[in-house]
Amino acid sequence: MVPTSLSPDDTSDPVPRSSSDIQGFCHNYPLRRHKYEDQANKGSQQCRDDWEQYIGPIERWGCGNPWEGHFAAVVLPFCRPDRIAIISYCFEYAFMYDNVVESAAKSTVNINRDDIALDETEYRTVRSVTGTKQIQSKMLLDLLSIDPVCAEVVIDSWKTMIDTTVKQDKTRTFSNLEEYVDFRIIDTGAPFVDTLMRFGMNILLTPEEEELVAPIVKPCYAALGLANDYFSFDIEWEEFQQPESNQSTMTNAVWLFMQWHQVDEQEAKRRVRQVTNDYEREYQQRVRDFISGEGKSNTKLQLYLTALGYQIPGNIAWSLRCPRYHPWLCEEGSALLRASMDEARDVCNEGKRRSISGDSISSESSVWSGASDRSARSSVSSAPSLDEGKEPDRVMLGTEHLLGPAEYIASLPSKGVREAFIDALNVWLVLPDRFVGVIKSIAKTLHNASLMLDDIEDGSPLRRGQPATHTIFGQALTINSANFVLIQAMDQVRQLEDSRCLDIFVEEMRNLFIGQSFDLYWTRQDECPSEEEYREMIRQKTGGLFRLVARLMMQKATLKKNQHISLEPLVDLMGEYFQIRDDYKNLTEEYTGQKGFCEDLDEGKFSFPLIHAHKLLPEWSEIRLLLQQGRQSGGLDVTQKQLVLGRLHDSGSMAYTEKTLRGLMGEIRLRIDQVEKESGCSNWVLKLLVHRLEV
């Protein structure tokens, strides 16, 4: 993707300096400041407002700097004006996330679940799990709505950063600078900022281009991380020395130089500045070599590397007086920032830009493991055991054959739609964390049981791109394991401590099995249902699990005023959309790599597109004959499937399915709006989920 042709002068102004460097950094690096800094400030302020609304008070400063400029304004001067607000929102969130999270946030994008579900590990000070998910969902949804292709790059980078930093040992020791720099590049999130910059410029790099520029950009990342250490050291050192601090080490190059060379902090700072200068010069040289060599004709990469270079002086300039590193400036900075936001457009039009001096600064300027504290493999019954008083030397049978199939299906990758759906409903219903965990475990347990049984009943050899459970363990063991897991799900419902929840469970399980019985009957008897019959089957079978978790959550909701909001129409629509979407994607190339090429045709199932085609095509059509043959022979070959697909397209059945999905999506969004008005609460988590499911 080539960036939209905006010149640097369209987006930013050069900032004059009295010397070629800024406090000994970024020699001969020009500095620019974005013309639309008011939008950057608005984006950050919106994030802070959302944080206070959904989570609670904010204790630390973020991106703002009324003297040298907002972080995004000076670090990303080439950013498109229409994208700087959302990027600043992301920066602000990242700063606040860094403030409160010790290892990994209690909720963040799940690395294993295709960006749909949200993890829950550990918070340090964040009050609201749901609130964090709300902010993340709103942020991701905005990125995806602006530029879905570039947004996916940002999301992947965020996931990689979170997954990597979670695994980083913050207490580790470093023996040399190179080892520390490799650690710090990831720890500071420099690659993530890089992808946000590309998003802002509408630049998309191919994997080959990423590999080509990797050695060029590394010294830039290193310079950014070390400069961050230099300017943040004073406040980190002060916190480190507090009596209540339990830290044994600091993740800061200044501190490491003090330890390595037994020097005081001023000498250590000087040495950090010196090695930072080396990386700055190395980046300039590598860019020059690339532009004069193999990148001579690659204008996209030249622009990208030039823009990346502006991060170095921008980061230094912002660090000079940002209240984040100089907390005594917070009060004055807040007053100036409020005033500047009111007058920002006038300031931009008049070209008012403060000069940065090289002088010193003054203050003026397992399947169910998460559901219970009890052992996952022991009974939770409080009744006396029949085993009590038995001989102690009796042979004890293990659970490996009982749980093996269940643990296998649970180990396969999942998109986590149901877990994300629970997170979304909890925005409105606000259940205690322990009940949310139990309901998620119930949903996962039931879903895994249904997958094991469905694959046997449908004769499916694959599940999520891997061998189906029964092809490994055999049908008998798989059925036995699935039956046990269903009982385990009922046992988990008891942990909700509400007899009505058990009634709800039985009601919806009954609906689910009734729906499944019709699906199996139609396939076995070669009886094509009407569209109305099929949709009712979906409502009971696929919608049953969605409806079960919704009803359980409403029963346990802490906000009594929201216990009676009309969620059932929305939940039924979600179930219907999810199944028809699955039918559609099973017949598209995108889905075939996971579940097998058009596997529904092998199974002879009457999916939504086939039902529509049956209404239009004659009784003796190739589709009916081929489906009958597939049921008898155990499947169709590729050419037969391609013929069926061709007929489905020719008959307009695929187009009709797409139209139906669009209509359902419109109804879902309308229902979301209605529930938001009824509850008085926006649901960004659900909006993001719906956006990710949209075909």
From Swiss-Prot:
This is Variediene synthase. Mg(2+) 3 binds at D454, D458. Mg(2+) 2 binds at D98. GO terms for molecular function: lyase activity; metal ion binding; prenyltransferase activity. It comes from the Eukaryota. Dimethylallyl diphosphate binds at R463, K541, T542, Q579, N586, K595, K605. The conserved DDXXD motifs as well as the NSE/DTE motif are important for the catalytic activity, presumably through binding to Mg(2+). PANTHER family: GERANYLGERANYL PYROPHOSPHATE SYNTHASE (PTHR12001), THIJ_PFPI FAMILY PROTEIN (AFU_ORTHOLOGUE AFUA_3G01210)-RELATED (PTHR12001:SF72). A motif (NSE/DTE) lies at residues 228-236. Residues 357-385 have a biased composition (Low complexity). Isopentenyl diphosphate binds at K415, R418, H447, R464. It comes from Aspergillus brasiliensis (strain CBS 101740 / IMI 381727 / IBT 21946). One of its GO terms (biological process) is mycotoxin biosynthetic process. It holds the Pfam family polyprenyl_synt. In the N-terminal section; belongs to the terpene synthase family. In the C-terminal section; belongs to the FPP/GGPP synthase family. Mg(2+) 4 binds at D454, D458. It catalyses: isopentenyl diphosphate + (2E,6E)-farnesyl diphosphate = (2E,6E,10E)-geranylgeranyl diphosphate + diphosphate; (2E,6E,10E)-geranylgeranyl diphosphate = variediene + diphosphate. A motif (DDXXD 1) lies at residues 98-102. Its EC number is 4.2.3.-, 2.5.1.29. Mg(2+) 1 binds at D98. Residues 1-23, 353-392 are annotated as: Disordered. Hexamer. Substrate binds at D98, R184, I185, I186, D187, N228, S232, F233, D234, I235, E236, R324, Y325. A motif (DDXXD 2) lies at residues 454-458. Its cofactor is Mg(2+). Keywords: Isoprene biosynthesis, Lyase, Magnesium, Metal-binding, Multifunctional enzyme, Repeat, Transferase.
